């Protein structure tokens, strides 16, 4: 298994129990969507899977190793094999898009090469190619502060694709995009995962997108796994219970009409 959790609890420093009793296995090459209401623990779970947060109890295995039994150096080497796509990518405002994308390889480069890349981007064609897949090739030398929220999200995705990881974890990666663009972007991510055998786990508020693109759906509520089902087995009853007391989101928040057509699942 690429990712395995057994009896996992995670308690934040303020004492809040964010995850409790998680049992979960995800195989290499699986595409999994995590859905659930706000505050359910989706982002915390992704940070746990990225080895950015340690569990408070239980056993965590990532790519065949227990990350918190490794040295800091070994754990950093493990993280090179994992890409975490943030809902709001932490990109310096004055950084150029080409540099932001090439930062996907910083974990592999030494200090000297990394500093040189800040002055003279080392792989402009590579950055251009991955940006072109996301319809951003014309933004190659634009500063990040000039981009919209949806464009910044696509730059974060481009950086993850350029990194070429074995595991890709995406936290609300299309929340700032209109429905058509969100659908296209998720289709691209899923197709990349299929072609390269990448394990893809994404948290999504837009349930319709999750069901359209991911074969496996995990519902999380109150820090626990509420259900773990094939997409075809997820019923309205499952969703009503998962999102009790919260309005169900079927598409990203946008000014674009929600009736925009959806393309087939990847």
PLM regions and their residue ranges:
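Conserved ABC ATPase "signature" region
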Residues: 113-138
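The feature captures the beta-strand-to-loop junction immediately N-terminal to the Walker
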Residues: 35-37
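Conserved ABC transporter NBD signature motif
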Residues: 58-66, 78
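Catalytic Walker B motif of ABC-type/P-loop ATPase nucleotide-binding domains
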Residues: 168-171
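Helix-to-loop junction immediately C-terminal to a conserved catalytic motif
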Residues: 50
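H-loop/switch region of ABC-family ATPase nucleotide-binding domains
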Residues: 204-205
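Conserved ABC ATPase signature
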Residues: 143-147, 151
């Amino acid at each position: 298994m690429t990712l395995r959790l057994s009896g996992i609890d995670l308690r934040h420093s303020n004492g809040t129990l964010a995850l409790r009793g998680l049992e979960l296995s995800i195989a290499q090459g699986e595409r999994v969507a995590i859905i659930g209401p706000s505050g359910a623990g989706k982002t915390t779970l992704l940070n746990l899977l990225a080895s950015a947060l340690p569990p408070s109890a239980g056993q965590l295995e990532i790519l065949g190793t227990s990350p918190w039994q490794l040295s800091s150096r070994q754990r950093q080497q493990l993280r090179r094999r994992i890409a975490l796509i943030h809902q709001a990518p932490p990109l310096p405002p004055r950084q150029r898009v080409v540099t932001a994308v090439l930062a996907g390889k910083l974990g592999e480069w030494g200090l000297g090469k990394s500093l040189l890349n800040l002055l003279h981007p080392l792989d402009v064609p590579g950055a251009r190619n991955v940006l072109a897949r996301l319809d951003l090739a014309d933004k190659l030398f634009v500063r990040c502060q000039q981009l919209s929220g949806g464009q910044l999200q696509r730059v974060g995705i481009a950086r993850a694709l350029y990194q070429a990881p074995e595991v890709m974890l995406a936290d609300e990666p299309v929340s700032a995009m209109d429905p058509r663009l969100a659908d296209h972007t998720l289709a691209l991510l899923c197709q990349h995962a299929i072609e390269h055998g990448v394990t893809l786990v994404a948290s999504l508020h837009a349930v319709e997108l999750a069901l359209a693109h991911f074969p496996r759906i995990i519902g999380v509520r109150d820090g626990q796994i509420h259900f773990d089902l094939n997409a075809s087995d997820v019923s309205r009853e499952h969703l009503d219970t998962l999102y009790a007391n919260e309005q169900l989101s079927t598409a990203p928040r946008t000014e674009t009409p929600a009736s925009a057509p959806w393309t087939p699942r990847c």
